Amino acid sequence: MGKRFIFILMACSLLSIATVVHAQHIDKQTYTFAIKKADTLKLDKYVMIDQIQGTQSKPVILFTFGGGFKGGRRDNPDYISYFHFLARAGYVVVSTDYRTQLKDIDKSEYSDLQGFSSALQQAITCAVEDFGDATNYIIEHSVEWQINPAQIIACGSSAGAITALQAEYEICNQTAFADRLPANFNYAGVISFSGAICANGIPKWIMSPCPLMLFHGDADSTVPFTKAVVEEMGLWGSNFICMQLKEKETAYYFYIAEGIGHSLSYSPMKDNRHDILSFLNRLVLGKEKRYITTVEKNPEISRYKSDFTIEDYIRENMR
């Protein structure tokens, strides 16, 4: 009798463990959302398996990769654990392709300031258009995927962060990009890992943006922490954006790492996951109006370069 009881107990325990493992399994599906000449654009959807059977609509994280508009992958292995973390937290995660317009351009064509400025603007415009098409695809499948189209959060790393921020900037200024999306659509929030906004002259916001979470190192020589301007065209980084958000009294979470370079384009996906969840739960889903700034200081870093020129940024991005 005792042996039988122990056997039953062990069987129940194994069944319980198997149930937990099954519940935590992440389902991944891949879809083609656009074909543009030679480019077939796809997106990957990640959702926790036990949520597929639910009836409640879920918020979405729409992620776009980094790579200097020259390369990068939506399924970069370094991103996957971040996607799974968010999926287990109750989000549907969508990682999307976009056309990387700088990959086939001869570097000699944008080695000077004007050439670089023009090529970069074209690459950003192209990436943002594709990001909008991915957004539309999600909205069109919102019922089938059981997601809430009013709770789509844009997220990106480096070039992807520029793309996500630029998309929000275009919506707020009611440009032609906004016409590609449903009327009155806006993202519920934006999470930017070392991003910036591209604008001719100082950025102006006709409408206030959604809550923004900005990660940036003040020693970043790839994407400007504050700004990099060529005549009128400029890249306006997280620090400048945050100053504007303060003036507009718009909710934000700004994470500054002093003495740190472009590693903030990926490290928060591992090191700041719970900060990200706090932003999502409070400022995005909870609609709390908060102005949060966190400054990370490393006492071992006392002297570092942060006053980069536009030539420095071009040199770094041509590697």
Q: Model segments located where?
A:
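N-terminal cap/lid segment of alpha/beta-hydrolase-fold proteins
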Residues: 23-56
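Short beta-strand element of the alpha/beta-hydrolase
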Residues: 56-68
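Serine-hydrolase catalytic-loop signature spanning alpha/beta hydrolases and amidase-signature enzymes
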Residues: 68-71, 93, 137
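Short amphipathic alpha-helix adjacent to the substrate-entry channel of hydrolases
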Residues: 74-96, 103-105
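Alpha/beta-hydrolase active-site loop
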Residues: 113-144, 237
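The feature captures the conserved acid-bearing segment of alpha/beta-hydrolase catalytic domains
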Residues: 178-249
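C-terminal catalytic histidine-bearing segment of alpha/beta-hydrolase fold enzymes
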Residues: 246-319
